[in-house]
């Protein structure tokens, strides 16, 4: 299996820790405001946020595959697909740990993140001019959503579904 080692794993886990902690803080603030009457309609219909998930996702796994020295291949390559499965499974395990740590529900979603994919790709291009992003050279850079195939990968939906099938069930 293709595994992250050392600093790459620490960076990924550190980013997840920040996201989980941030979501916990936001949940606490919103719950406090809800209980103090600032969201009366929400309070009436939901009552509480205890049964609601704090969601963590990822973007740009296609570009991770293109930029990773040990892969250099997009999501259509079985090695990149396998690496993506490992990352998603690891994220699921971490989310389970956060549920125990914080006492709230956490989930992994293939989140739509169009504006975020553009913003992060733009910043990354500035910092690392040679980085591979989605789109054509000279176009506005962006990352593909979650673990999606490149936008122009195929016109055959069944081909795309065959590749995405195992990945999408991990969200």
Kindly label every feature range from the protein language model.
Residues 1-6, 10-11:
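Single conserved hydrophobic/aromatic residue that forms the stacking wall/gate
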């Amino acid at each position: 299996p293709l595994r992250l080692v050392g600093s790459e794993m620490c960076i990924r886990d550190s980013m997840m820790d920040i996201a989980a902690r941030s979501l916990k803080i936001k949940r606490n603030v919103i719950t406090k405001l809800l209980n103090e009457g600032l969201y009366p309609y929400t309070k009436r219909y939901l009552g509480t946020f205890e049964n609601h998930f704090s969601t963590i996702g990822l973007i740009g796994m296609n570009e991770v595959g293109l930029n990773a020295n040990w892969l250099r291949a997009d999501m259509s390559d079985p090695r990149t697909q396998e690496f993506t499965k490992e990352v998603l499974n690891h994220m699921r395990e971490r989310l389970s740990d956060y549920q125990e740590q914080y006492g709230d529900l956490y989930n992994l979603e293939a989140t739509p993140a169009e504006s975020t994919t553009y913003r992060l790709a733009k910043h990354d291009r500035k910092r690392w001019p040679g980085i591979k992003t989605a789109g054509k050279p000279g176009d506005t850079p962006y990352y593909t959503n979650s673990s999606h195939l490149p936008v122009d990968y195929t016109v055959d939906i069944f081909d795309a579904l065959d590749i995405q099938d195992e990945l999408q069930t991990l969200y």
